Amino acid sequence: MFRVLNDDVYSPAEIQQQNPLAFGKASSLFTDNRSANDQCETGENVRESGQDHVKRPMNAFIVWSRERRRKVALENPKMQNSEISKQLGYEWKRLTDAEKRPFFEEAQRLLAVHRDKYPGYKYRPRRKTKRQQKLLPADSSKLCKQMHIETLQPFTYRDGCANTTGSRMESQLSLSQSVTITNSFFQNEHHSSWTNLGHNRVTLATQISADFPFYQSLQPGLSCAYFQY
């Protein structure tokens, strides 16, 4: 029994020998996904892979808030970054022009150094949406399209339900109309049958009174005679 179980267990090398094409496709897809994830984590851009990203020169507020942010973060370790930024903006507005002057001078000095180092620099903001789309390989883009189509299937299913509901309502309406017509037909037939039956009874009574002369010799309390027919 143990020998049979051991024979059923296949090693990765045997699987690769049996189906090398499928194994190669799976491995290539796995490596492509890993490379795409690595690019997303490191923030590398395909367009700027061969060029170093040049940062903008710091302004007076950035020069002041760089040290102040560290102090606030150390004093309030549980405070979020967004709250720290709000507090720094409020404090910067409360500073006077004399208190802001040294930071403006430092920002002017950094701007001059940046111009000397990068004479033809132009600020070009990155577009995050296009950058994320370019980072995706061909296989992952196809997978995203397939996932997008699968997410749209519930809406198609709802449309199908609406169509089936409409067809059911139309069938029920036609069925109710046919039932109404059938009921009216049976009512007319029933009324005509009762009318014919009453007419036949009157004709039968007239024939009986004409055919039997002893009808007049009945007792004075009786106005009619009943016969089984």
Swiss-Prot record:
InterPro entries: HMG_box_dom, HMG_box_dom_sf, SRY, SRY-related_HMG-box_TF-like
Residue spans crossing the bilayer: none
GO biological process: cell differentiation; male sex determination; sex differentiation
PROSITE patterns xrefs: HMG_BOX_2 (PS50118)
Cell location: Nucleus speckle; Cytoplasm; Nucleus
Source organism superkingdom: Eukaryota
MF terms (GO), sorted A to Z: calmodulin binding; DNA-binding transcription activator activity, RNA polymerase II-specific; RNA polymerase II cis-regulatory region sequence-specific DNA binding
Segments of the chain annotated as binding DNA: 54-122
Pfam families per the UniProt record, alphabetical: HMG_box
Gene3D superfamilies for this protein: High mobility group box domain (1.10.30.10)
Keywords attached to this entry: Acetylation, Activator, Calmodulin-binding, Cytoplasm, Differentiation, DNA-binding, Nucleus, Repressor, Sexual differentiation, Transcription, Transcription regulation
Post-translational modification: Acetylation of Lys-130 contributes to its nuclear localization and enhances its interaction with KPNB1. Deacetylated by HDAC3.
CDD domains: HMG-box_SoxA_SoxB_SoxG
One cellular component (GO) term of this entry: nuclear speck
Record has DNA-binding as a keyword: yes
Function: Transcriptional regulator that controls a genetic switch in male development. It is necessary and sufficient for initiating male sex determination by directing the development of supporting cell precursors (pre-Sertoli cells) as Sertoli rather than granulosa cells. Involved in different aspects of gene regulation including promoter activation or repression. Binds to the DNA consensus sequence 5'-[AT]AACAA[AT]-3'. SRY HMG box recognizes DNA by partial intercalation in the minor groove and promotes DNA bending. Also involved in pre-mRNA splicing.
Subunit text: Interacts with CALM, EP300, HDAC3, KPNB1, ZNF208 isoform KRAB-O, PARP1, SLC9A3R2 and WT1. The interaction with EP300 modulates its DNA-binding activity. The interaction with KPNB1 is sensitive to dissociation by Ran in the GTP-bound form. Interaction with PARP1 impaired its DNA-binding activity.
Family: Belongs to the SRY family.
Protein known as: Sex-determining region Y protein
Natural source organism: Elaphurus davidianus (Pere David's deer)
